[in-house]
UniProtKB/Swiss-Prot annotation:
The active site is at S100 (phosphoserine intermediate). It is an enzyme of class 5 (isomerase). The modification Phosphoserine is found at S100. It holds the Pfam family PGM_PMM_III. Its EC number is 5.4.2.10. The keyword Metal-binding applies. SUPFAM superfamilies: Phosphoglucomutase, C-terminal domain (SSF55957), Phosphoglucomutase, first 3 domains (SSF53738). Binds 1 Mg(2+) ion per subunit. This is Phosphoglucosamine mutase. One of its GO terms (biological process) is peptidoglycan biosynthetic process. Mg(2+) binds at S100, D240, D242, D244. GO terms for cellular component: cytosol. It catalyses: alpha-D-glucosamine 1-phosphate = D-glucosamine 6-phosphate.
Length: 448
């Protein structure tokens, strides 16, 4: 991670940290780095439903146009929609304005290369070096060499038609409850599932610029669980603000997280001969029960650091086609180049249709270890990881576990938080381990 780029692009409080002035520079320098070898390059831009999206989009567009790039605005669309369309429309770069599952005051900017993949560390470092230069020495085209802007608001439908082709039959006879987090999927997901002839119930589909992720979406699936039970739905599907995550709810109202969705997909893909190298790529945050379930089905697992970009890097390196995170980023590399909530949802419902099994039965084949994750707001993430008292309490707890569980303490990639996670045979033991570590972290480096 650099000075500006975190694990998922540039993030910050809109108009305070992520200002229009910075967005202009990111557009100008990012556009230059990604398109400098092309004459009249094309760059596409999408955004989620945050009120700050228009402000940042205007600044980004200006920065891109100043390099001579032709800019195509997609309007409100999901992050994977931008990734797909970047490649499908032959653009040199794609840009998404979103802070994903973060609250409304935050926003972010992430780039995709012409292949639809997120940027490499080297590309981000090149952009950062330009951002830090005191003098902007980039070429400044004038007159007819300046870029122009156009709108392509039909892009969302083009993307939906593409992912719809990945399922084998329609969803008639199924009742599906959707929670779109008042975000980018609000006008996409209901259309997609209705088009596949499912009966649908919806929530979180009334974005007003202020309510994205507010008590709804993939970070609050318990709200969708109530809707599933109330409507008697067969499955609930919760997306986050930019549509790159999926958390599901079974017909009984139980939450089905990213680990369980990955396991269900892995087992089905293995049975149907689709799982490349018989391997799933996940992060160190995945539940122990996930690894045990894979092992029981003779499926190999490959672990990476936390962040879907690291999962993707490992998938590309090893030639794998399934990976993801417990948080609901599921990457199906046969179809798309980033985590995709709606695509994952299609595959999950398709597996229910093809196996004729309810989601509770499919998810029940994986037994989760009790887990607790606590986020501690800190003054300095780096100091926390170097603190001797924090290191000591982690060592003591790991010794007590004696291999029967695990502890993970790591910094957030996007916020001033330390995440403390434990898994153990019982919830009581698990909670005890976490709270002991949290108390020390708070005492040593906790923010007010």
């Amino acid at each position: 991670m650099g000075k500006y780029f975190g694990t998922d692009g540039v993030r910050g409080v809109a108009n305070k940290e992520l200002t229009p002035e910075l967005a202009f520079k990111i557009g100008r320098f990012g556009g230059y780095v990604l398109t400098k070898d092309t004459d009249r390059p094309k760059v596409i831009i999408g955004r989620d439903t945050r009120v700050s999206g228009h402000m940042l989009e205007g600044a980004l567009v200006a920065g891109l146009l100043s390099t001579g790039a032709e800019v195509m605005r997609l309007g409100v669309i999901s992050t994977p929609g931008v990734a797909y369309l970047t490649k499908a429309l032959g653009a040199q770069a794609g840009v998404m304005i979103s802070a994903s599952h973060n609250p409304v005051q935050d926003n972010g900017i992430k780039f995709f290369g012409s292949d639809g993949f997120k940027l490499t560390d080297e590309q981000e470092a090149e952009i950062e070096a330009l951002l830090d230069k005191e003098v902007d020495e980039l070429p400044r085209p004038t007159g007819t060499n300046l870029g122009q802007v156009s709108d392509y608001f039909e892009g969302g439908q083009k993307y939906l038609q593409y992912i719809k082709q990945t399922v084998e039959e329609d969803f008639s006879g199924l009742h599906i409850a959707l929670d779109c987090a008042h975000g980018a999927t609000s006008s996409l997901a209901p259309y997609l599932f209705a088009d596949l002839e499912a009966d649908i119930s919806t929530m979180g589909t009334s974005p007003n610029g202020m309510n994205i992720n507010a008590g709804v979406g993939s970070t609050h699936p318990e709200v969708l669980a109530e809707l599933v039970k109330e409507k008697g739905a067969d499955i609930g599907l919760a997306f986050d603000g930019d549509g790159d995550r999926l958390i599901a709810v079974d017909e009984k109202g139980n939450i089905v997280d990213g680990d369980q969705i990955m396991f269900i997909c892995a087992k089905y893909m293995k049975e149907t001969g689709q799982l490349k190298h018989n391997t799933v790529v996940s992060t160190v945050m995945s539940n122990l029960g996930f690894y045990k379930a894979l092992e029981a089905n003779n499926i190999t697992s490959d672990k990476t650091a936390v962040g879907d970009r690291y999962v993707m890097e490992e998938m590309k390196r090893g030639g794998y086609n399934l990976g993801g995170e417990q948080s609901g980023h599921i990457i199906l590399l046969d179809y798309i180049t980033t985590g995709d909530g709606m695509l994952s949802a299609l595959q999950l419902v398709n597996i229910m249709k093809m196996t004729k099994k309810p989601l509770s039965e499919l998810a029940g084949e994986m037994t989760k270890f009790p887990q607790l994750l606590v986020n501690v707001r800190v003054t300095d993430k780096k100091l926390a990881l170097e603190n001797e008292k924090i290191k000591e309490i982690i060592r003591v707890v790991e010794e007590e576990m004696n291999g029967d569980g695990r502890i993970l303490v790591r910094p957030s990639g996007t916020e001033p938080l330390i995440r403390v996670m434990a898994e153990a045979p019982t919830q009581e033991i698990c909670d005890g381990y976490v709270h002991r570590i949290v108390e020390v972290v708070k005492a040593e480096v906790g923010a007010e």
